[in-house]
Amino acid sequence: MAPNLSKAKDDLIGDVVAVDGLIKPPRFTLKGKDLAVDGHPFLLDVPANIRLTPASTLVPNSDVPAAAAGSFLGFDAPAAKDRHVVPIGKLRDTRFMSIFRFKVWWTTHWVGTNGRDVENETQMMILDQSGTKSSPTGPRPYVLLLPIVEGPFRACLESGKAEDYVHMVLESGSSTVRGSVFRSAVYLHAGDDPFDLVKDAMRVVRAHLGTFRLMEEKTPPPIVDKFGWCTWDAFYLKVHPEGVWEGVRRLADGGCPPGLVLIDDGWQSICHDDDDLGSGAEGMNRTSAGEQMPCRLIKFQENYKFREYKGGMGGFVREMKAAFPTVEQVYVWHALCGYWGGLRPGAPGLPPAKVVAPRLSPGLQRTMEDLAVDKIVNNGVGLVDPRRARELYEGLHSHLQASGIDGVKVDVIHLLEMVCEEYGGRVELAKAYFAGLTESVRRHFNGNGVIASMEHCNDFMLLGTEAVALGRVGDDFWCTDPSGDPDGTFWLQGCHMVHCAYNSLWMGAFIHPDWDMFQSTHPCAAFHAASRAVSGGPVYVSDAVGCHDFDLLRRLALPDGTILRCERYALPTRDCLFADPLHDGKTMLKIWNVNKFSGVLGAFNCQGGGWSREARRNMCAAGFSVPVTARASPADVEWSHGGGGGDRFAVYFVEARKLQLLRRDESVELTLEPFTYELLVVAPVRAIVSPELGIGFAPIGLANMLNAGGAVQGFEAARKDGDVAAEVAVKGAGEMVAYSSARPRLCKVNGQDAEFKYEDGIVTVDVPWTGSSKKLSRVEYFY
């Protein structure tokens, strides 16, 4: 039963709160029948059973000052039930962006203006700020509506259809777990910066729930700085040691050795239910990709393909790391429940398991049809009792650690909500499994050696991220459309970009975003590579063995298996937040990020397909796949998050290889063909002053790299032997580009005079490879 808050707290609704020692009214109030923020109504005709509680009454301001900007929504129900669908008010003529589950496992972006536009299984909504100052308190701020968990219940939002009502959906997942009184199922937060809005809100929710840690409290695993290779598209389930070895060798021979090797599905010991456990037969060679969901795990040890290698999996990993020194990290795949179909009941050496029939909630029934879900529902899941979940992860991970494995990709995470009926509901089952996973990861994989996948739901974010610090933020990279649409080779790539960019706004508070692998020989490979380069996350490919575009890969990876990574994770620019970059025929997806001494903008034409509300699936929308024009400005970069900032910028177009000077409020026009891109390095111009002249200077970076600005690791101006000098520390090798308002008298690289070119304000000089990304080159410009 949900906790019944005291009458005293109910009496505080709409009362004053203390902020920095001052008594102020709460920002959210019930104004007559309307829910308002700073006096601006945004949800109309709120039902009488809705309860509003200032966040500061549940989360003291002294702990989290941001609580002063928030409130919790709850309700009283006439009867205790395991699932409630409750209207919270009408939303009309107010632009919103949202994140909703379009598949069981995955979420994406959705926009609208009315309650009827809200999608099923919405995990987050942001209402746009108003553009008028009709109120004494100024324009309406951005408002975040964040469904969370309360007791054993989990919340989401959906459309009420009639009269533009928005509904709060609260469900336990078990008919035995019921409640009728709720006070904190949805969190509301107000703010003037949409990016700070989300981060501040998550800090309040973190203090309120105490069930997760924010990404700002954690460190991502070292693979985020590695160039990686994943075996999935190369082998699918047929992965084997010799093939993995050959794949690494071919990349190394081409000058792009991986620092990460991810052995995906296909290494485990599994069988079908009709296989005789006593026969010793294994099922991996009797199934195929897309058909493995009915299979179940029969032992923690690797299957015969790896077991028969001299020394088993451990021997293979040791020899591979010794032969290829750049390979510092080896990860393997496994499902949250062990395998797609869980564990085989009665398998010796495994904790006891019971086959449970999954049940889809009404919300999940309205998601996109998924063959993987269908197969799991039809065959059930061999579920370990939650009280013994620790044994599952300890047995699996201890063996992997002993074999030299550095981390795991944990997939099929959002399965638990379908099998929770007999286990206290979705929240309690998730807590038990995530606690076991967290404990094991801390013991065996340095506390953060995990990639979370198929995890796009607030249950995981709010309950499973105590230790997990890296997770996929998009649906799988589909090289072709599994439904057979030949145009899917292209429009699905635009969908992938949009999934990742907008999901990061929400998920980035909990986990570092991972934009998934791609193939370097795909028709849209450069489109993908550009997004990965500035995503701020790991960069890894799933190329078939020996099938590589090395010219493209060398723009991503350094010769020692590392990458040039941005300082944070990429997010959509403000002017894209409430727009539709997939099927409005006019919006260009723009994302921003920062490097140490510059900002970066990525512009992508993703138009051409996406979610269809009518068909309940992603579909081609070829009519929108047209050239798109947009404007890009230094102001698109959120400089308060890093990169330097300033009033004058040297903007370098990585693909066009041109430079333009812009002030902060100036912009430049970009036109992109479908599924093409441009990357802009936005480098603040710094004045280098000498008695004789003033010089404007901005280090751009390595023009041969997609994240050119990521190469600049240090920058300072100094006087040397009477000369004015700009000194830049460079990571990587290639053509170093800088803006200079005057021609340098001399350039030096690592103390040696170097030839350089100067044309139209651009200085270029070649920088050699030092042998290690840890050893930076020193480039000096003398005036």
Curated annotation (Swiss-Prot):
Q: Which InterPro entries match?
A: Aldolase_TIM, Glycoside_hydrolase_SF, Glycosyl_hydrolases_36
The UniProt note on temperature reads: Optimum temperature is 45 degrees Celsius.
Q: Give the top-level enzyme category.
A: transferase
**pH effects:** Optimum pH is 7.0.
Mind telling me which Gene3D superfamilies this protein's record contains? Aldolase class I (3.20.20.70)
- Spell out the activity regulation: Inhibited by Ag(2)+, Hg(2+), Zn(2+), p-chloromercuribenzoate (pCMB) and 1-deoxygalactonojirimycin.
Could you list this entry's UniProt keywords, alphabetically sorted. Answer: Carbohydrate metabolism, Glycosyltransferase, Transferase
Q: Which reaction does it catalyse?
A: alpha-D-galactosyl-(1->3)-1D-myo-inositol + sucrose = raffinose + myo-inositol
**Which EC numbers characterise this protein's activity in its record?**
2.4.1.82
Q: Which domain of life is it from?
A: Eukaryota
Q: Which GO terms describe its molecular function?
A: galactinol-sucrose galactosyltransferase activity
Please describe what this protein does. Transglycosidase operating by a ping-pong reaction mechanism. Involved in the synthesis of raffinose, a major soluble carbohydrate in seeds, roots and tubers. Specific for galactinol and p-nitrophenyl-alpha-D-galactoside as galactosyl donors. Able to utilize sucrose, lactose, 4-beta-galactobiose, N-acetyl-D-lactosamine, trehalose and lacto-N-biose as acceptors. May also act as a glycoside hydrolase.
* Family indicated by similarity: Belongs to the glycosyl hydrolases 36 family.
Q: What is this protein called?
A: Galactinol--sucrose galactosyltransferase
Organism of derivation? Oryza sativa subsp. japonica (Rice)
Gene that produces this protein: RFS
